[in-house]
């Protein structure tokens, strides 16, 4: 599976901007006009916020500023918000995101009629042993039968760096039943995290971050039931140079209206010591098959 890298989409912002240190974990939707809307995590060296950007046809990306700030839902996200996942619903937009309360990340939900002004709905699900020290990086998937929620769980092992992909299901998106871990670190992996799942022809494709402790690559797995996954290995690794020379992280894959597949992700250049991630993109040029 060969991707065509398109380079850097959004660099860290200017000094004093909310993404001046890093721009991370993008989530992209395409609207009816063909415009691309992005929500992403921005960090200024102190606080995570959720930011918004747009790319209209024939234009570059334009930053739209802060979509959601720390304390949006109250005490449960008072110290920062990040890792948005946005889906279109009949009533507007639904966002799942991570909020930090000063001790641990917890999953939250918010709704919006147009995707700009959001209404907080607080936390969802109690944490378990698999995400005892943090639940983050949610991915919402609506199938014909149910809603799925995939997310990263941190159990505190390996100095807090070990992560697994967990899943939950819901008939409507209002209440969730935990299914537990569906993808664990394998072999030399320290963490499997940051899931992004697409449903194509009744098959689920999970793009996720595979962390070996030194570099992060984007890996791919497939499933027909959402619970048992077949690993297909790395689909996009660090390039060795340029904006993603050291790491390719936190993917968001999107099937566009024309049927093609694009992916936005967080890149880290070789020599970076500040974790100054920037948002990059790649395109899958051929017919889609695993």
Predicted feature locations:
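Beta-rich carbohydrate-recognition and catalytic domains
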Residues: 1-79, 87-136, 141-190, 198-246, ...
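Conserved active-site neighborhood of enzyme catalytic/cofactor-binding cores
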Residues: 252
């Amino acid at each position: 599976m060969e991707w065509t890298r398109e380079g850097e989409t959004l660099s860290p912002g200017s000094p004093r901007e909310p993404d001046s240190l890093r721009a991370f974990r993008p989530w992209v939707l395409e609207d009816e006009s063909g415009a691309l809307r992005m929500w992403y995590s921005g960090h200024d060296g102190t606080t995570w916020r959720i930011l918004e950007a747009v790319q209209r046809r024939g234009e570059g990306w334009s930053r739209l500023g802060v979509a959601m700030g720390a304390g949006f839902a109250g005490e449960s996200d008072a110290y920062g918000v990040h890792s948005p996942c946005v889906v279109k619903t009949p009533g507007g937009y639904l966002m799942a995101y991570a909020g930090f309360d000063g001790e641990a990340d917890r999953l939250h939900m918010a709704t919006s009629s147009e995707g700009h002004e959001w209404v907080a709905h607080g936390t969802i699900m109690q944490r378990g042993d698999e995400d005892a020290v943090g639940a983050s990086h949610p991915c919402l998937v609506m199938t014909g039968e149910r809603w799925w929620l995939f997310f990263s769980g941190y159990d505190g092992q390996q100095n807090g760096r070990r992560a697994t992909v967990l899943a939950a299901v819901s008939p409507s998106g209002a209440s969730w039943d935990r299914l537990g871990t569906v993808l664990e670190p394998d072999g030399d992996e320290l963490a499997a995290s940051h899931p992004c799942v697409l449903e194509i022809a009744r098959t689920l494709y999970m793009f996720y971050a595979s962390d070996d402790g030194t570099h992060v690559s984007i890996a791919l797995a497939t499933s027909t039931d959402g619970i048992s996954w077949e690993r297909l290995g790395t689909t996009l690794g660090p390039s060795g140079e340029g904006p993603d020379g050291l790491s390719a992280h936190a993917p968001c894959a999107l099937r566009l209206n024309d049927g093609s597949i694009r992916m936005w992700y967080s890149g880290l250049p070789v020599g970076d010591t500040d974790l100054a991630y920037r948002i990059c993109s790649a395109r899958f040029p051929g017919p889609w098959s695993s």
